[in-house]
């Protein structure tokens, strides 16, 4: 679940994307892009209260290895409040920028 005032921080978009609709759009596009990418979370750090997590992931798309981190904050209702994505290496970041942009355009209809 996503909070109405949630914020998404993309590794390639310079301004935070605010609002449930935009956060949902970015997460949905990522789900489509990573769908067949052998995506896996390989490590996690969760705070004692359980409302913040850093999740390291790996994937591979078009022969390019992707390593990244999702930093997620949940509000007191258990809804996503803040979602930040970091990606490396640069080759993977550039490829994801292209694929995410295309997917978001496709989803607009």
Predicted regions, residues:
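Hydrophobic pocket/interface hotspot
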Residues: 1-2, 6, 19, 23, ...
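A solvent-exposed, acidic/Ser-Thr-rich amphipathic alpha-helical stretch
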Residues: 4-50
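A beta-strand edge to alpha-helix "cap/lid" segment located at domain peripheries
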Residues: 31-109
